[in-house]
Each structure stands twice: as structure tokens, then as C-alpha cells.
From Swiss-Prot:
Keyword Transport included in the entry's annotation: no
This protein's record includes keyword Secreted: yes
Family to which the UniProt record says this protein belongs: Belongs to the vitelline membrane family.
Annotated compartments: Secreted
Pfam family, one: Vitelline_membr
Domain of life, per lineage: Eukaryota
Native species: Drosophila persimilis
Signal peptide: 1-19
Protein name, per record: Vitelline membrane protein Vm32E
GO cellular component: egg chorion; extracellular space; vitelline envelope
VM domain sequence ranges: 40-79
Job of this protein: Major early eggshell protein.
Keywords of the record: Secreted, Signal
MF (Gene Ontology): structural constituent of vitelline membrane
Length: 122
């Protein structure tokens, strides 16, 4: 019975693998997009950003300056250490944890072995 199920799985896998392979009957690949031949367009001048105000005279705001390169000096108010909440478990607790996992796996293995023996005849 197990052999028949295994063969069925192998046949289904082979059929799926053959179906996913590319064949000579596949649709041709689409044509490549034509190369663009745009002429270079100069960048527009800095726009005039008007600040909104209740005053009748609107004055354009100056363009933003480029950011200065990062300095490696003081970070000002952000110099505190980041708190660390993750600590190492003591060795004894870690050893007990691994022992419990091993015992649980052993118990599961013995249960499955016992169920297999009960179904057999001597």
C-alpha cells in the first residue's frame, strides 16, 4: 500500500515537472522596447514657493539649501545609550530548557513506537 502511494506521488511530481518545463510551443517572447531618443532637457529653475499668510504681500521663500555632510561630532540631545532588553539566559536555565525539549521528543518517539508494536502480531 505504501509503495502504491509512493509511486503515485512520484508520477504526480514528474507530471508537474514536465508541465512546468518550457516547450517549443510556447508563445514567442515580446519584442524589445524601442530605445528612447529624448533630447536632454535642462532642469527648470528653482520654483518660487510662496509662504501662505494672511498678509496681502506674499514673498517667495528661498530654495532649500543642500544638506551638509554628516558630521561625526556630538549628536546633541541624542547621546543617550539605547536600552537593551535582551539578556543572556543563565547556563543552568538553558541546560534545563534543552533537557525538557529532549525529554518531550523522546516521549513522543516512545509513544509512536508503542503504537506500532500494538498493531503487530508476534
Amino acid at each position: 500500500m505504501k509503495t502504491v502511494a509512493f509511486l503515485a506521488v512520484v508520477v504526480l511530481f514528474a507530471a508537474f515537472a514536465c508541465a512546468s518545463c518550457s516547450s517549443s510551443y510556447a508563445a514567442p517572447a515580446p519584442a524589445a522596447a524601442p530605445a528612447s531618443s529624448y533630447s536632454s532637457v535642462p532642469a527648470p529653475p528653482c520654483p518660487k514657493n510662496y509662504l501662505f499668510s494672511c498678509q496681502p504681500n506674499l514673498v517667495p521663500a528661498p530654495c532649500a539649501q543642500q544638506a551638509a555632510p554628516a558630521a561625526y561630532g556630538s549628536a546633541g540631545a541624542y547621546t543617550e545609550q539605547v536600552p537593551s532588553y535582551i539578556g543572556f539566559a543563565p547556563y543552568q536555565q538553558l541546560q534545563q530548557y534543552h533537557q525538557r525539549i529532549g525529554n518531550a521528543a523522546l516521549i513522543d518517539e516512545l509513544r509512536s513506537l508503542g503504537q506500532g508494536i500494538q498493531g503487530q502480531q508476534y
